[in-house]
Amino acid sequence: MLVKVFSFFILMITMVVIGVSKEYCDDKHSCQNFLLELKTASSSLSEIRRRDLLIIVLKNSVRKIDMAMIGVMEDTKQHEEMENDKLCLKEDTNLFEEMMESAKDRMIRSVEELLGGEFPYLGSYENIHTWLSGVLTSYITCIDEIGDGAYKRRVEPQLQDLISKAKVALALFISISPRDNTELNSVVPNSPSWLSHVDKKDLYLNAEALKKIADVVVAKDGTGKYNTVNAAIAAAPQHSHKRFIIYIKTGIYDEIVAIENTKPNLTLIGDGQDSTIITGNLSASNVRRTFYTATFASNGKGFIGVDMCFRNTVGPAKGPAVALRVSGDMSVIYRCRVEGYQDALYPHIDRQFYRECFITGTVDFICGNAAAVFQFCQIVARQPNMGQSNFITAQSRETKDDKSGFSIQNCNITASSDLDTATVKTYLGRPWRIFSTVAVLQSFIGDLVDPAGWTPWEGETGLSTLHYREYQNRGPGAVTSRRVKWSGFKVMKDPKQATEFTVAKLLDGETWLKESRIPYKSGL
């Protein structure tokens, strides 16, 4: 009986996958095998049935992850003594496990949301779209970061298979149309408990008031409960639905901080971006994997960082060195300073909002595959290593179905005092992956930016599939007459087109940003 039921489900999956099979099977044998296993038949199923099939695909992928992790773990134990570089092996193993858990968590959440009463209304729909994009990004992060060697040869077949399944799941999801329900979409959940001691009439976050009700205080001088940021984060509860507030007093905190995904809803408030400083000096030259070079990494959903500095002191000569990596959905960075050189800010995954921040770096200094909006930020290019150019963005959208992209709105793009603009070229961005998506809207662009505006990553790759957009910018670097002539680049004239890159559209921000009490501009 069970065999018949399973065969029936497989048949249903084959009926729905026909519409997405060719596009995602041309390049990977694993995807071909997957779709061959499903045996395409018909695509005339209702959207409810498509939802049911997507749930089956996701549950199957969760089981595949569990099997892959067990298999890789056993294989690694057998070959551990043969590995020459134990540090690399440890980093690769940790990264593989972390990204598999990341993907698994997002798929489980997606299944729960698919079964919820609000799908496919917009808020629920955008949640799932974000998380399924994050599943794909998690797998690709593994492929990108794990070093070439025996370990990669062991895990790559499983990763390629999972990547193919993630692309199919995304395409299947996109085949379901969202429903617009203004009432559902505009409802903001009840004010979180952390606002119960603050005047809820305050439209915007009151940092001084929140400091007084902080759950814990960190201070270098001993006036707080803890003297390190890590100790305070360790004290935060796991899997909490209530916000946990950590007030970090003035001081330089020389420590590498990582918030696990089991600790959502953390708020860290400092005394100002020039007063509360978290600093580190890891780089690809000593940690090997860019992902783990971050001075501060947040993996928890709903993270809010306010009035502090995230700094990586490694200079421009040592390659990628992240100051801040954000890998949690619905994260907000407000009035913070992000300071580094190559890969300084890594908006890795999911929805993120940056407001009134100071961001400085050199090569690809805003990089990743998040859906991120930057509003009223100071984006400052600094002097790179000799012979290098500056690239402000390196966005890594993998497929047209991804829910990701960077939007730079009402920001100032300028040069630091040490940047020699006469000899160093600076570009708005280059495509890390072929569907790289970046929009610069209503911003000031200084004369540091090359007239071409944008530059290729390698040859002609991605120049017709990327989405680079500019809209109503000003300043000497905003002149578009000499911009690149790629088919993927456009100067937008229609505000309806530009609206796609706003908080409301790119982040679905109206459904979650109000809770943060951080000021934001929803549209243009």
Curated annotation (Swiss-Prot):
Stored CDD domains: PMEI-like_4
Segments of this protein annotated with the region Pectinesterase 42: 215-510
Active site per UniProt: D343, D364
Alphabetical UniProt keywords: Aspartyl esterase, Cell wall, Cell wall biogenesis/degradation, Disulfide bond, Glycoprotein, Hydrolase, Secreted, Signal
Catalytic activity, reaction form: [(1->4)-alpha-D-galacturonosyl methyl ester](n) + n H2O = [(1->4)-alpha-D-galacturonosyl](n) + n methanol + n H(+)
Matching InterPro entries: Invertase/methylesterase_inhib (IPR035513), Pectin_lyas_fold (IPR012334), Pectin_lyase_fold/virulence (IPR011050), Pectinesterase_cat (IPR000070), Pectinesterase_inhib_dom (IPR006501), Pectinesterase_Tyr_AS (IPR018040)
Tissue: Expressed in siliques but not in flower buds.
Cellular component GO terms, alphabetical: extracellular region
Residues that, per the record, bind substrate: T290, R430, W432
Name listed for the protein in its UniProt record: Probable pectinesterase/pectinesterase inhibitor 42
Lineage: Eukaryota, Viridiplantae, Streptophyta, Embryophyta, Tracheophyta
